[in-house]
């Protein structure tokens, strides 16, 4: 399964972000490193949750499909926010002075994700519960990243992660992904029904 590589990859992005922050590499990491850290951590938590539940309910088609379809939705913010920064009037970045527009573009992209979740829920109601789970994580990301965008509270943690060996962080992410796959698969196994005992005549 490729899921451990996804979580390991997200952990690698955290590693690059933290090491760039410690090295003072680039104004974006210096401005938003803490916010990116919490956003990525919540993304990992979201993926672990929806993938575990997708495996657990793999015998229930609607639930399984719903959780699997939330995975690209969680990824949607990253490319769409970059498109906003490239082309959207009022959010387009033309120079260093426009870098503070990065966070509003991320929040607008997440707001669009929530609009998609709302539209799916209005159409399918109880069958769309997996999207409500993903929506809860998206709301948590919006609040955490919006509040902590310029906060110094996460800086000590970011420095600590930046000073860790990269392999430790990436392999931890890989292990979390592997453990999630194993746990979800086992949770979805059919319960063994004991064979009836033949009665003596």
Q: What are these model-derived regions, one by one?
A:
Residues 1-201:
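Alpha-helical membrane insertion/targeting regions
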